[in-house]
Each structure stands twice: as C-alpha cells, then as structure tokens.
C-alpha cells in the first residue's frame, strides 16, 4: 500500500475513508469531490414526494444518522467539508436556490462532468436535481441514474431508487492505495515545474528526442522520490 494526498491522486481513484469506499471525481481549490463507490441503500428521495432536495427526507438522513455513522469511524479530526449545493433544476429554474450540506447527492451537472470516471451501479440511484419545480407544475419528479449510466427521472416518494452519497473532502487528506494503482500522472503544478527545469537546462530546445526523454525521465524520477519522502514524513 502507498499513501498519497488526495490532491495528488488521479480522477477515478478508489479509496477508503470513514468506513466507506469512495471514488475521487475532481479536485478544486483544496476540495476533493468524492462519490460513494456503491449504493448504500434504497430509500425515497423524499417521503413526502417533494423534489426539492433542500427539504427532502434523504438530505436529512444523509446529514443526520448517516453522517454520524461516518464520523464514528474517523480517527481524529475529520476531513468532511460543508458546501453550498446548487439546486438549479434540469430545465434551468432556480426556485429551489441552494442548500448547505456535508453529505449530498450529486447534481446533474456534477454527474455529467465526471461521467467518465463514475462506474455504473447495480441499481437506480438518485441525483439531487429536480426535473422542474412546483411553480412549473412538477413538484415531485427528481432526476436519477439508471444501471447503464443514462439519466432518467422518478417520483420522489419512490423507495426503489438508491442513495449514492457524495461529499467534499479536504484534498490534503492522505489516502492509501495499492502500489500498482499509484499514478505517475503529473499535476499541472508539477508539469510546470518540470517544463521550467527542462527549459532552464536546455535553453528551451532539445538536440534529440532521446535527450528530451532522458531529461524528462530524470525529472519524473526525482518527483516520485520527493513524493515518497513527503509521505514518509507526514
């Protein structure tokens, strides 16, 4: 096993935290958007058949009993971050505004943006985005994801769809991954450092392709060694 900071992990990396298996979707300004690897249970979006996630029973459950169970499995200060979730509906209405949450269901936009690294599930699962709003004649339809990854909708009271929690974690969180899953992908920050170093050494030009390959291999080896040294001291 190898420990790396979440901010240095590749999109799609699977890891365990707080007794739950997560998938890293994206890193943004110190915050890592993560999705549960599996559906945790089937449950109504809202027991009162309301498609506004801000007042939905699923939101209360995820940020109540479910979050409490996660925190019980955290050893020390937790890395969960609160966020303002955009509840713009699928047709662009903003009646539902935003809501402050720690654990949530992905929005349609978050799902679409990260579809390439989200594995299909073995059941339908809810998103937090409503089909439309009560003012437009749709107070109960909410978006969901089907087993093949396509988008669909269902009545909010349905207990046949699953909850697949999402969260933002501090991107400095150290996670454990298998050595063969460790990536040599270079972040934009590290890529800039490598290019600057190569340009300084060779004056911005390379005599041969072999020269470029050798120099880049050396820089990547140095970068890997530095990361491993940092991990040992954290």
How would you describe each model-predicted region?
Residues 1-189:
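Collagenous Gly-X-Y triple-helix signature in extracellular proteins
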Residues 186-203:
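N-terminal acidic leader/helix
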Residues 202-210:
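Charged, low-complexity interaction regions
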Residues 173, 220-230:
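C-terminal alpha-helix/helix-terminus motif
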Residues 10, 149-150, 195, 214, ...:
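N-terminal secretory targeting and juxtamembrane "stalk" segments of secreted and cell-surface proteins
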Residues 190-193, 209-224:
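Alpha-helical segments embedded in low-complexity/disordered contexts
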Residues 1, 227-234:
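Short intrinsically disordered terminal tails
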């Amino acid at each position: 096993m190898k420990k790396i900071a979440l901010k240095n992990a590749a999109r799609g990396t699977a890891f365990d935290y707080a007794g739950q298996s997560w998938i890293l979707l994206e890193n943004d300004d110190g915050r890592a958007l993560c999705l549960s690897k599996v559906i945790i249970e089937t449950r109504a979006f809202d027991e009162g058949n309301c498609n506004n996630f801000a007042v939905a029973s699923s939101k209360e459950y995820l940020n109540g009993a479910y979050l409490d169970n996660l925190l019980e499995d955290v050893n020390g200060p937790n890395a969960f971050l609160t966020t303002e979730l955009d509840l713009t509906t699928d047709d662009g209405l903003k009646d539902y505004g935003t809501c402050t949450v720690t654990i949530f269901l992905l929005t349609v936009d978050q799902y679409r943006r990260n579809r390439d690294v989200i594995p299909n599930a073995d059941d339908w699962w809810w998103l937090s985005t409503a089909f439309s709003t009560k003012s437009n004649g749709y107070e109960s339809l909410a978006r969901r994801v089907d087993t093949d990854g396509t988008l669909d909708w269902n009545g909010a009271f349905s207990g046949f769809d699953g909850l697949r929690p999402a969260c933002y974690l501090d991107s400095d969180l150290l996670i454990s991954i298998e050595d063969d899953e460790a990536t040599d992908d270079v972040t934009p920050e590290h890529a800039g450092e490598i290019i600057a170093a190569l340009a300084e050494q060779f004056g911005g030009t390379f005599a041969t392709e072999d020269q470029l390959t050798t120099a880049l291999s050396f820089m990547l080896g140095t970068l890997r060694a530095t990361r491993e040294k940092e991990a040992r001291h954290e």
